[in-house]
Amino acid sequence: MAARHRAGKTIVKMDNGPREKLMRYGAADLSDEELLAIFLRTGTPGMDVMTLAKRLLAHFGSLYGLLSADIRPFRDIGGVGMAKYAQLKAIGELARRYYRSRPCEETALLSPTITRDFLESQLAEQEREVFLVIFLDSQNRIIRQNTLFTGTLSHVEVHPREIVREAVRLNAAGIILAHNHPSGRAEPSRADKMVTERIVKSCQLVDIRVLDHLVIGRGEYVSFAERGWI
C-alpha cells in the first residue's frame, strides 16, 4: 500500500491489486468494494481506499443506498469531504445515463434482475409519481419505453385504454408496467392492485401479455409477478 503526503497529512493510496485484477480477469470478477476503490482512487487521512470503500458500503447498506444518498449521511463518516461525495454522485448519474442511452433494440429484458435495475435507473430519483410502460417484442426486446402518466407526490392517474392503444400501435407482444413511490416505500396500494387488474384485463382482449408491474421505492421494489399477482 503506497502513501503520499499533502499539507502535513498522509493520504493512503490504493495499491494496484484491484486494477491489476480488473485488467487480468475483467470488471465482473471484482467485488463491489474493489470496483468502488478503483473509482475513488485514494483514501482519506489515515484510511486506505479499500477500507474506505468497505466502510461506505457497510454504512449505506448497498451500492444503491450509497449512490442515491444525499450529503447529510456523509457527514457521519470522518474524512469524507465534498470531493468524494461529488465523485459518488457522478458515478450514480453516469450509471443512470448509461441505461437511458442504450439503443432500445439492444436492450433485452431477459431476467427480473435486469428489469429491476433498468427501471430503478429510470424511476428511483423521480420526485413525483410517474407511470412508465415498457413495450416489448416477442423476444422481450424493448420497442419503446414511455412515461405515459405523471402525477403528484403521492398519486398518479392511469388510463388502461391509453396503454392498450399505444401497445397496439407499436405492435407490442407484451408490456411491463412500472411506477415509483417517492415516499420510498415500495409496497403497492389497493389502488395499485386494482389498476393493474384493469390493465391486464384490457390487454387480454387484444392478446397482449402484461409480464409484470414493478413498484420502485428507495432501495426497495415490489414485483407483482414475483408475488404471483400477475
From Swiss-Prot:
Residues the record lists as binding Zn(2+): H179, H181, D192
Pfam families: RadC, UPF0758_N
GO BP term (any one): proteolysis
GO MF annotation terms: metal ion binding; metallopeptidase activity
Domain MPN stretches: 108-230
Organism superkingdom: Bacteria
Gene3D superfamilies registered for this protein in UniProt: Cytidine Deaminase, domain 2 (3.40.140.10)
Extent of motif JAMM motif: 179-192
Keywords: Hydrolase, Metal-binding, Metalloprotease, Protease, Zinc
Family under the similarity heading: Belongs to the UPF0758 family. YicR subfamily.
Protein name: UPF0758 protein ESA_04094
Species per Swiss-Prot/TrEMBL record: Cronobacter sakazakii (strain ATCC BAA-894)
